[in-house]
């Protein structure tokens, strides 16, 4: 069974443009990759609401965006978490896709899946493979995050509606939601499985909840060194647009990164730790994909 077809209720883009890009950005900040729902809010957003936009990014990262694979997991697993032909790592397509009406980020990603299936004839399937992972476990001190207020409404519908709206500056009304900000992380009414999923971005491996803890927590994590920061440097070196910024980045940014604790150090103060082990990891295998024709 392929994953090329999504739900019949998935809305479609009103306008979608796909153009091959063979140039390099003069400004590294010109690189763009994201989908933002019409209910997202952030002063840092450069993508208009209700759109998916990619610029100067290899197709592999676009597919990863559509199927919710964090970029920080692509390189540590050496391509095994998203396998396909070599050209998806080097060919760059700028995509601008605008939704017709109000949409969430989760809906936009489903719409992007449909767009990739239509224009790139993308067909893929999911598999579960045994791979290195981290287990999130408690220390003897126990979890130090405060329990979330019990009178807060946090059903599964709320989780589906807000889980992907990571750009929000306010968590009012949200549950199972996170707001990353310059390496720090705030979570409102999240369980340990939610937290493990988010930690995968920082740790560079899939994190599986093994705490056995029930209930919801309000989480406030300090800025940490993210595996994604190292991945971005590596990707800039290996991709077709390498050299646009340089491996080390601005000297000031390097000092800032070096001053932060790792996610492993930061977790200890909250009564948690990550243990290296093996476990099931969901991977995407591309069965077929074609280079699209120009618009």
What name fits each language-model region?
Residues 1-295:
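Beta-strand-rich assembly/attachment modules of structural machines
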């Amino acid at each position: 069974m392929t994953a090329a077809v999504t739900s019949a209720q998935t809305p479609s883009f009103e306008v979608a443009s796909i153009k091959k890009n063979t140039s390099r950005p003069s400004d590294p900040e010109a690189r763009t990759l994201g989908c933002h729902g019409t209910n997202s809010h952030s002063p840092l957003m450069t993508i208009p609401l209700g759109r998916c936009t990619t610029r100067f990014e290899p197709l592999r990262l676009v597919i990863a965006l559509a199927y919710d694979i964090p970029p920080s997991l692509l390189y540590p697993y050496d391509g095994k978490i998203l396998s396909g032909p070599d050209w998806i790592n080097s060919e760059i397509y700028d995509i601008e896709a605008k939704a017709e009406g109000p949409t969430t980020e989760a809906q936009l990603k489903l719409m992007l899946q449909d767009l990739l299936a239509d224009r790139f004839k993308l067909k893929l399937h999911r598999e579960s493979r045994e791979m290195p992972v981290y287990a999130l476990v408690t220390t003897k001190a126990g979890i130090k995050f405060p329990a979330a207020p019990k009178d807060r409404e946090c059903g599964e519908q709320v989780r589906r509606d807000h889980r992907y709206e990571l750009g929000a500056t306010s968590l009012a009304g949200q549950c199972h939601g996170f707001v990353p900000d310059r390496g720090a992380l705030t979570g409102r009414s999240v369980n340990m499985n939610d937290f493990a999923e988010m930690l995968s971005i920082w740790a560079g491996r899939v994190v599986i909840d093994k705490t056995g803890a029930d209930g919801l927590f309000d989480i406030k994590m300090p800025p940490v060194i993210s595996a994604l920061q190292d991945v971005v440097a590596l990707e800039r070196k290996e991709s077709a647009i390498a050299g646009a910024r340089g491996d080390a980045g601005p000297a000031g940014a390097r000092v800032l990164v070096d001053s932060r604790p790792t996610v492993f150090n930061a977790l200890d103060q909250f009564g948690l730790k990550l243990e290296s082990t093996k476990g099931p990891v969901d991977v995407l295998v591309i069965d077929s994909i074609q280079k699209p024709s120009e618009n």
